[in-house]
Amino acid sequence: PLPPPEKIEDLKKELDTYIGLGEVKREVNNLINMATVFKRREEMGLPNADFSLHMVFTGNPGTGKTMIARLMARIYRSLGILSKGQLVEVDRSGLVAGYVGQTAIKTSKVIEKALGGVLFIDEAYALNGKGDNDFGQEAIDTLLKAMEDHRDDLVVIVAGYDGLMEKFIHSNPGLESRFNRYLHFDDYSLDEMLEIF
């Protein structure tokens, strides 16, 4: 059996202890407030605006993206939005296979593991392959369908460098319509680096 969900106050305190990430912390707190209102309205049977929980994390490697993705999974579980709150982390090689039809199967298996939690795809722009023999598009199509079919119990966070991520999202209307929440992770300052290490 799953351990009971953590208290949202405890998770907010944990977020506060992270070094740097000023803008990210503000955004996460906003998101917690919005998600709380969304959940309350849902419980009261009131109509809700369409509220997408999927996110794009942009920034250089080593800026805290995976750490925040893991925390988001726990936050969404705490708020009753996700049933399990686990994080499944993959990159292109975890989704794409070498032959026609295999990529959809491989991607579906990963999605199955992520149901109830967050699927975190690092360097997601690498799915935008070049040439006819690339199966990245098959992975994207499978992912988009799963985001629709499991909209109540799956959150997808895609991450990578700034410009490349924006290009990736805008390359596909399906991605564009589902990912409209961006969180930018700045590089740590010298002082912050000293605090971390």
Task: Label every model-predicted segment.
Residues 4, 46-85, 109-113, 179:
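Walker A/P-loop
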Residues 10-53, 74:
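Pre-Walker A (pre-P-loop) alpha-helix and adjacent loop at the N terminus of AAA/AAA+ ATPase modules
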Residues 83-114, 137:
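Short glycine-rich substrate-engagement loop in P-loop NTPases that contacts/grips substrate
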Residues 99-103, 125-140, 151, 167-169:
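Conserved ATPase-coupling elements of RecA-like P-loop NTPase cores
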Residues 111-113, 139-154:
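Substrate-engagement module of ASCE P-loop NTPases
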Residues 120-122, 141-142, 154-161:
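Structural recognition of the conserved hydrophobic beta-strand(s) that form the central parallel beta-sheet
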Residues 170-187:
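A short helix-turn-beta junction within AAA+ P-loop NTPase domains corresponding to the substrate/partner-engaging
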Residues 185-197:
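Conserved small helical "lid"/interfacial subdomain of P-loop NTPases
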